[in-house]
Amino acid sequence: IIANYGAGFNNIDVTYASKRGIWVTNTPNVLHETTADLTWAMILGTARRIVSADRYVREGKFQGWGAKLFLGGDIHEKTLGIIGLGEIGRSVAKRAIGFNMRTLYHQRNRLPKEGEQELNIEYVTFEKILRESDFLTLHVPLTEATEYLIGNDEIALMKKTAYLIHTARGKVIDDYALVAALKEGRLAGAALDVYENEPEITEGMSELT
């Protein structure tokens, strides 16, 4: 038996395991609150430039207060876009209520009106969620439909002031397109928990601050 620690199992060749008579199990519905917390840590950290500011101080560069030094961006009353409203996406949406955000979501199947009202969320098209989100967070599984869901064309639709948050599966984003967009100032920032070709970090990613 291969008992996978987590809900996803795309790291296992299930077809081959089945041929060899090996059972494959996963552990769904145990980490969605934890991952939602991580998502919000990444939203806050990226918007407020916490990691960059911490590195700046530790490197001995801090020379005193500056009005625009690591100014960052606000979260309160901004627009949050959630792509994929499974258990993690819903938990992320619940936390957005405390920031009085306008929360948009997109997935294949729309929730009943009661579910949308409970989470204070609005269903929109894929194009609209790209265009209107100040913070776009991804919570989809890796499938043929979601592989490279976000690439050059999708980033081109996003605001230059937008932040992209990624805690799903690496190949949902074209990392090279993301690196180029960040270097060229076509996005305000990004926070990634996963990479396209793990364990390798995409070329150019570590140079970004």
PLM feature spans:
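Phosphate/diphosphate ligand-binding glycine-rich loop within oxidoreductases
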Residues: 1-58, 72, 164
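Rossmann-like dinucleotide/phosphate-binding beta-alpha-beta segment
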Residues: 65-160
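Rossmann-like dinucleotide-binding domain for NAD(H)/NADP(H)
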Residues: 24-25, 161-209
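Rossmann-fold NAD(P) dinucleotide-binding segment
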Residues: 1, 13-16, 145-164, 175-176
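Short glycine-rich, flexible loops that bind phosphorylated cofactors or substrates
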Residues: 10-11, 143-145, 172-173, 199
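Short glycine-/small-residue-rich Rossmann-like dinucleotide-binding loops
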Residues: 7, 134, 140-142, 168-169, ...
